[in-house]
Amino acid sequence: VIVEVDEGQHRGYAEQCECARISEIVGAIGGKSVAFVRYNPDTVRYGGTVHSVTAAERIDLLVETVKSELGRVSSRFEVRLIQLWYDAPMAEAKREMDITMLVAV
């Protein structure tokens, strides 16, 4: 489990660069399954409207997510991306994606 703090949701980063960076990390850890937990400490908008979230709510979800990922057992190689407190069209504090096909070489 790799936790990243993404100030400003890293909006300025190109998706290709992010995939290349993640691919390098996966290769460096020996091709083992990994979950990237990305935590946005800044303002979050749902449907364009600012959503108020306390620091305690943010940390609670981060800790819960990390604990859950540490206990997760996978029967296959996978690379997962979990975004916490990112902008979204609807209220969604946590988004999970399997990005194995995007980053595995």
Per-range role (PLM):
Residues 19-33:
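Conserved short loop/helix modules at catalytic or binding sites
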Residues 1-20, 41-45:
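Short beta-strand-loop-alpha-helix junction that forms the active-site gateway
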Residues 30-105:
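Basic, glycine-rich
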Residues 16-19, 23, 56, 60:
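Short, well-ordered alpha-helical segments
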